[in-house]
């Protein structure tokens, strides 16, 4: 590859990656603020139900992603890659900004969660069209034999988008008081996205169409009905189903377990301080992100199949030991409380409620803050926040990093794997659907399903209740591993590119 072509593809990578990263930021800022959002847009009389409702709304955005894949995939195979993922960028950015403008449940009642749900669905539709367009656009610019390496840069954007969402939240919290952030500051990360979208739109606007698609359009070989050709043709449908059940289904649950469920688990099951979770997760993501490129590059050398399959296998075998070790870092029953009276304060609120805060310290440096809110004619609401020690923080960073490493193994090569399975004229449509079903349905529902399993097991009195949420990703990844090992060919198919 010449110097000019190297410069050209870096321009393509930059434009595609920046836009896709912003869309992931927009999509995941909702999940990163799920604990706060549950208190703003849903009834506050049952915090657990409100949090589960927030996760369900978060999951709704994933459920519609396949529909976005079909709509925008068809559009991308007919009018082109460039203009399609420009449209998805604007739809995502506008929806995210408006979520930050919705009045609270206390102000407009059930209209608040309804508006959030509608905008969340629009976010899901937009993301359903974005990833396939960006991955296809980059792959169709990349030279033969290097598609794993170049498309792996797109694979970093989901993790980088999550990382930036955490950093924006931390930055906002650092300049505002806890009261101000809880009152209105949580809206700032949603508003910030509109500026980033504007910059990315201008960059994408000046990009050329994919040379492979432009050539096909000039020769008149583009599809007039990509949906029919993708799913009505038994030969193509076979590869769509193989991509889903032999790759993206397992990749989806590994991705969301290693990043989003890990975050949710630390905040809601382990009760680690929210800012500490954002910080340690951000560090683990920062350390792990380069491995997307490593495994994408390696897949060009040895094939995609075994890297992805072994990533799933390692995750299946390791999840329960990893999460048991995570839980034990904040298990108060294994720590020694300092023998002195806990600090106790009570604060009266203007609405007639009162908040009692009890602070306990332990010999290893752990601090536990327990807040009891006494509402008039309502049950007592209890929340616990644990400030972990530096040693425990680095232990958790390591345990999350291991999970991120599994993510990079299954996710780094998958864009190249998918685009190589389908011909140019139906590529956008054919690769988008299995990707977004695997990630949107199987992966996106994971936080809500796993949290429900944990909550149910805890209510049932199981000693290791906190591990029950892992059965879902273990089973799904296990099924995918078996199908992938049997039916996927390790030879990278490049005949379509």
State where each predicted segment sits.
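Extracellular/periplasmic helix-loop-helix junction of adjacent transmembrane segments
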Residues: 34-67
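Low-complexity, proline/glycine-enriched hydrophobic segments characteristic of transmembrane helices
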Residues: 321-398, 458-461
């Amino acid at each position: 590859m010449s110097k000019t072509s190297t410069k050209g593809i870096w321009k393509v990578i930059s434009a595609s990656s920046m836009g896709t990263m912003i869309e992931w930021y927009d999509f995941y800022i909702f999940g990163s603020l799920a604990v706060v959002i549950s208190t703003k847009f849903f009834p506050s009389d049952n915090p657990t139900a409100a949090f589960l409702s927030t996760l369900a709304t978060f999951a709704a955005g994933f459920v519609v992603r396949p529909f976005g894949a079909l709509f925008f995939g068809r559009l991308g195979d007919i009018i082109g890659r460039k203009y399609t993922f420009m449209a998805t960028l604007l739809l995502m950015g506008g929806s995210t900004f408006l979520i930050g403008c919705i009045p609270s449940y206390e102000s407009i009642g059930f209209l608040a969660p309804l508006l959030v749900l509608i905008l969340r669905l629009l976010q899901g539709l937009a993301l359903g069209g974005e990833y396939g367009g960006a991955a296809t656009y980059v792959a169709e610019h990349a030279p033969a034999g290097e598609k794993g390496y170049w498309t792996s840069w797109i694979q970093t954007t989901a993790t980088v988008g999550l990382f930036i969402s955490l950093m924006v939240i931390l930055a906002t919290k650092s300049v505002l008081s806890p009261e101000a952030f809880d009152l209105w500051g949580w809206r700032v990360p949603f508003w910030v996205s509109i500026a980033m979208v504007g910059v990315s739109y201008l960059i994408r606007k000046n990009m050329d169409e994919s040379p492979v698609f432009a050539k096909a359009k000039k020769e008149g070989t583009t599809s007039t009905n990509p949906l029919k050709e993708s799913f009505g043709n038994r030969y193509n449908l076979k590869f769509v189903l193989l991509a889903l059940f032999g790759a993206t289904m397992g990749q989806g649950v590994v991705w969301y377990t290693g990043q989003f469920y890990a975050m949710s688990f630390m905040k809601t099951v382990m009760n680690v301080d929210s800012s500490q979770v954002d910080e340690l997760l951000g560090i683990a993501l920062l350390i792990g992100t380069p491995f997307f490129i490593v495994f994408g590059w390696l897949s060009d050398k040895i094939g995609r199949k075994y890297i992805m399959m072994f990533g799933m296998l390692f995750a299946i075998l390791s999840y329960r030991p990893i999460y048991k070790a995570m839980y034990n870092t904040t298990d108060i029953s294994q720590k020694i409380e300092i023998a002195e009276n806990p600090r106790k304060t009570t604060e009266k609120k203007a609405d007639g409620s009162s908040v009692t805060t009890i602070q306990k310290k332990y010999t290893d440096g752990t601090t536990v803050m327990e807040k009891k809110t006494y509402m008039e004619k309502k049950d007592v609401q209890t929340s616990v926040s644990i400030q972990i020690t530096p040693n425990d923080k680095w232990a958790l960073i390591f345990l999350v990093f291991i999970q991120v490493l599994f993510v990079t193994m299954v996710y780094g090569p998958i864009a190249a794997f998918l685009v190589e399975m389908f011909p140019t004229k139906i590529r956008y449509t054919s690769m988008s659907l299995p990707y977004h079903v695997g990630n949107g349905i199987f992966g996106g529902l994971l936080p809500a399903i796993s949290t429900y399993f944990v909550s149910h097991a805890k209510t049932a009195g199981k000693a290791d209740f906190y591990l029950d949420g892992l059965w879902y990703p273990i089973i799904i990844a296990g099924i995918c591993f078996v199908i992938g090992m049997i039916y996927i060919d390790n030879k990278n198919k490049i005949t379509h590119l």
